[in-house]
């Protein structure tokens, strides 16, 4: 059976619907950076998702290629994630989607090296006749965070975020959003196929001791 990061690391991907504190270790991702409203039909965000999945599945299917990755094991491609911010705003202003800046990411298995990533970019570029130069290898250690499972529409996230911040303060922490520590979302549902009120999204905010 394929290794499923969501099931093997439930503390990071399947938190409860009440806030909790978690320390997230360093992970490797593939990433595309961009800006603008993620709901724009032909916008940067939609293009970024296509690029990410192109590389993610090239790496997953490398077992069928001449390029064999050392330590490879079969796995389920982890869910899409995003780091979000807006200049001049602490946190997120959901009414100003056009001002979003983001890093869209998908986690990589630890066995994927820089050489393997570079091979995947070359392979996907040749096979799909598409420019994958915006995709980068993105190692990131998130550290101490408060997180919660949000069930519902993306625009209803502020209520969950408020609950997270109250929990954080009650337990002696303060928000630590900076230019390197950002609002983080993990998308466990496909927004194209799931009703807004049933969407499952992990929301995570960086914190520090007050």
Regions found by a protein language model. Give the residues of each.
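A solvent-exposed interaction/effector surface
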Residues: 1-210
